[in-house]
């Protein structure tokens, strides 16, 4: 069971390794670990009331009709709103069932595209205390997230720009 939080930056040049850029997406993902581990069958996502609507929004230039892409191992496309709403209920029941199971591996994926550079981060960390303070703060933030994830038996994966 994987919780994915994605934020795409808009820098025109290669991104650096700012703690702020990473915190924007990662903080949200870590805050939502509860969605992966709770035994509360009735706990719904904060965006529950919009899961049956198009994504990202009705006014977006590129829009996907379905937020649910796969259901029970098959590609999903609803012929009408009633079917779409029923699919959201079915999908959420699967999530609720799996998150209660200790046999199901849980992961949080933090995707910080075009806003955080792994190369810049590594260069700054190799400078030790002379590295960028923002990068050193990002390191501390990542360590905190790893600790939180580990204490909840959740794997953490972070995807960033090169």
Q: Where are the model-predicted features located?
A:
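Conserved catalytic cores of phosphodiester-cleaving nucleases, focusing on short active-site segments
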Residues: 1-11
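Catalytic cores of nucleic-acid endonucleases
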Residues: 9-56, 108-111
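Generic detector of bulky aromatic hydrophobic side chains
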Residues: 12-14, 94, 101
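Amphipathic, oligomerization/interface secondary-structure segments
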Residues: 22, 27-34, 39, 81-95, ...
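Long, compositionally biased intrinsically disordered regions
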Residues: 59-66, 70-72, 76-89, 97-162
